[in-house]
From Swiss-Prot:
Consequences of knocking out this gene: Impairs methylation of the flavonoid skeleton at position C8-OH.
This enzyme's EC code(s): 2.1.1.-
InterPro entries hit by this protein: COMT-like (IPR016461), O_MeTrfase_dom (IPR001077), Plant_O-MeTrfase_dimerisation (IPR012967), SAM-dependent_MTases_sf (IPR029063), WH-like_DNA-bd_sf (IPR036388), WH_DNA-bd_sf (IPR036390)
Similarity-based family: Belongs to the class I-like SAM-binding methyltransferase superfamily. Cation-independent O-methyltransferase family.
Protein name stated in the entry: Methyltransferase cfoC
Enzymatic class: transferase
Function per UniProt: Methyltransferase; part of the gene cluster that mediates the biosynthesis of chlorflavonin, a fungal flavonoid with acetolactate synthase inhibitory activity. Within the pathway, cfoC is responsible for the methylation at position C8-OH of flavonoid. The pathway begins with the PKS-NRPS hybrid synthetase cfoA that uses benzoic acid or p-hydroxybenzoic acid as a starter unit with four rounds of chain elongation using malonyl-CoA to form the chalcone skeleton.
One function term, GO molecular function aspect: protein dimerization activity
Keyword line: Flavonoid biosynthesis, Methyltransferase, S-adenosyl-L-methionine, Transferase
Organism the protein comes from: Aspergillus candidus
Pathway: Secondary metabolite biosynthesis; flavonoid biosynthesis
Residue numbers annotated as active site: H308
Chain positions recorded as S-adenosyl-L-methionine binding sites: D268
Key word Methyltransferase present: yes
Gene: cfoC
Length: 401
């Protein structure tokens, strides 16, 4: 046996025992998650070592078909039928649900079975597995809708777009797939005109962290922000979520800290604010973050996955408006995004980086890039809080005066 394979097998076996030990006691602890990450990494390396070069190439070439099969599984109601059934489901039963032709449906089911998205328990007889269930969740269904309609076409065009610009780091959205496809129309303007896709986008954003740690898991929220807050002032604003979609972050703060004092303000574009539930205990405000922020002197301003949608010049505009609203020595800006290390970046962060590049000429930033960007607008990073490589960091930022 190849020495590398033997080494990886031993690593997988050892890590497997560690994961089993954690599973019985502290499944969601940092140590447990780290063991599982290491096991997944070793298992993927082992898969590569067990394949010959031709098989490795085939895996990458044909792997792009997998999301298309999953999309069919959702669109035809296959996954939902399997998950809802207490017994194995026949091809005939799936035909009744999907309305698909028997020959085509059999081909789709063979494809789904071959990528282990369903469990084939007999001839034309199927059961759900973990993958099946994953794509009946809000994250699985809304995410695949967004990725199929926007992200995947953008990725396909990326090599051509980069070649056309002489392989210069892209900063102009008009030169990337989305801008070329839709005559330079800004991405979020285009999305706002498509209610069904916009709904999928917001539902995906609300579940994007499923399977990952939340920033409130590792940032000492109360200890960092409550001591200096004037809870006796009924008009005092505790937190402003800038560009916060429909308010899932404020809702999570309120869920974890139900007694938190002060006003909680959600800001986003009018089309998004119109979707906010008025009973959720936050103030919803239509606001364009490229204009001055009307909420002055809040204890905390929060940005999650906003700056990664824009190049440095546009980010400077957003940040300067927030800086001008901050009270020196009191207000804090919390930026919740990836801070990619220069060595050992995880694939989740790098995949997101290329997704943003392809769609909007945007970027997931490195730690050095964050420091440079903040300094350029009169802000200072007090600390970067990071739990795990595949979890977005929390940058704690103050105003420099």
């Amino acid at each position: 046996m190849d020495p590398e394979v033997s080494k990886l097998l031993a690593t997988v076996t050892s890590l497997g025992e560690t994961v089993k030990k954690h599973a019985s006691t502290d499944k969601e602890s940092p140590a447990s998650r780290e063991s599982r990450r290491e096991l997944l990494s070793a298992a993927r390396q082992l898969t590569n070592e067990l394949q010959n070069e031709g098989q490795i190439v085939e895996g990458y070439l044909y792997g792009t078909i997998d999301p298309l099969l999953l999309k069919m599984g959702i669109d035809l109601g296959i996954f939902r039928k399997l998950v809802d059934s207490s017994t194995p489901v026949t091809l005939g039963e799936l035909m009744s649900v999907s309305g698909a032709d028997e020959v085509l449906l059999a081909r789709i089911m063979r494809g789904l079975s071959s990528i282990h998205a369903v469990r084939e328990v007999g001839v034309e007889l199927y059961e759900p597995n973990k993958v099946t269930r994953a794509f009946t969740t809000v994250k699985g269904q809304s995410g695949l809708d967004v990725f199929h309609n926007i992200n995947h076409p953008g990725w396909q065009s990326l090599p051509e777009c980069l070649r056309a610009t002489g392989y210069r780091n892209p900063t102009d959205p008009a030169k990337m797939w989305f801008g070329r496809q839709f005559n330079g129309e800004p991405y979020f303007d285009w999305l706002g005109k498509r209610p069904e896709l916009l709904s999928s986008f917001h539902r995906f954003m609300s579940t994007q962290r499923d399977g990952h740690a939340h920033w409130l898991d590792f940032y000492p929220f109360q200890q960092q922000l409550l001591p200096d807050f004037d809870a006796g002032d009924p008009d005092a604003v505790f937190m402003v979520d800038v560009g916060g979609s429909v308010g899932h972050e404020i809702q999570e703060v309120k869920r974890r800290y139900p007694g938190i004092p002060g006003r909680m303000v959600l800001q986003d574009v009018p089309a998004t604010i119109a979707r906010v539930d008025p009973e959720n205990g936050m103030e919803a405000m239509a606001h364009d973050f490229f204009t001055p922020n009307p909420i002055k002197g809040a204890r905390a301003y929060y940005l999650r996955n906003v700056l990664h949608d824009w190049d440095d010049d546009r980010c400077c505009v957003i940040l300067k408006h927030i800086r001008d609203a901050m009270t020196p020595g009191y207000s804090v800006l919390l930026i919740n995004e990836f801070s990619i290390p220069r060595k050992g970046a995880c694939s989740f962060a790098t995949h997101s980086d290329f997704m943003l590049m392809a769609i909007n000429a945007a970027v997931e930033r490195t730690e050095q890039q964050w420091y440079h960007l903040m300094k350029s607008v009169g802000l200072q990073i007090k600390k970067i809080w990071t739990l795990e490589p595949d979890t977005e960091s929390l940058l704690e930022v103050t105003r420099v005066d």
